[in-house]
Amino acid sequence: QAMREFQPALPLGVALSGGADSTALLIACAARWPGQVVALHVNHGLQSAAARFEQHCRGLCASLQVPLRISKVDARHQAGQSPEDAARIARYKAFEALALTEYAQPAIKSIAIAQHADDQVETLLLALSRGAGLPGLSAMPHRWERGGLAYCRPFLRVSGADIRRWLGEQQVAFVEDPTNTDVRFTRNRIRAQILPALQAAFPQFRDTFVRSASHAAQAQELLEELGAQDAQAVCGEDGHPRIKALQALSRARQANVLRYWLRNSYGVAPSAAQLQELQDQIAACVTRGHRIHIKVGQGFVQRSAVKLTWYNP
């Protein structure tokens, strides 16, 4: 069912790690669109099994007669950055380089990633544990665009167990990631301890959790549309919001347009505490001499005459 609903722009790149999920995705895509699929493998070099993953990918692609493009990256994390974030950033940069290189034929238009319903539930639970808003509760999108490519996750409504069951029926081998059982990682603890408990209490939890994330994503889209409309109304030609125009909005609508302005103009997101303080200062701004200077992200929002500006010192 998931593959029947999947209609990517072709040619298609498939992100292939060598694990069960990406192995299944490549086999399914290669069978459906022969001659239109390219496998993309990123070797992070972060674990001893990296060479085994790459070897499996080479053998699988040879058996399927699917072209394989490989990128070796330095995914070591910087200070203040999680290993997962560093690996993800390096991986997407590599995907873009592999897909868009002028020497690569065919020219890839879409990239499919094999994250599934269990991954989506884990992402949603992590967002809930952080007290995330709608962007976090939307979890992972089914489809998005980045760097001139369309990315897709066709397995987001399919359980990991169903994928492995299908691979078993096909008698296809894959490589087990040795880090998946390391409970020092939060995702692995969720997978090993929380998901089985949810399965016992609520057997349909994958479907309902994924549906909730979809509802949150739709609500976030509406807030984005409203934010764009309000930003056009409250911001001058210079793109900075006018304080009096902000004061005329309800507090919820004001918070939304401030988030929209900061994210789209500067790529920063205020914390809940920072946003509340900023709104309190906007409400109190009734005299010419009232000063606003609040830290947001790596910079500051400040009052400049009748408007707000953000700067990074």
Regions found by a protein language model. Name each.
Residues Q1-A192, P196:
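Core alpha/beta nucleotide-donor-binding catalytic domains of modification enzymes
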Residues R164-S214, Q218-E221, G299, V306, ...:
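Mid-to-C-terminal catalytic subdomains of enzymes
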Residues F155, D182, A197-Q204, A245-S250, ...:
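A general boundary/transition motif marking the beginning of the first structured unit of a protein
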Residues Q1-A20, W33-H44, V73-H77, A90, ...:
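AMP-forming adenylation/ATP pyrophosphatase catalytic core
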Residues R130, L134, G160, Q199-P203, ...:
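Alpha-helix boundary/capping and short turn/kink residues
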Residues I111, L156-R157, L198-Q199, A283-V286, ...:
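Short secondary-structure boundary micro-motifs
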Residues E102-D118, T208-L226:
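Electropositive, surface-exposed helix/loop patches at the edges of structured domains
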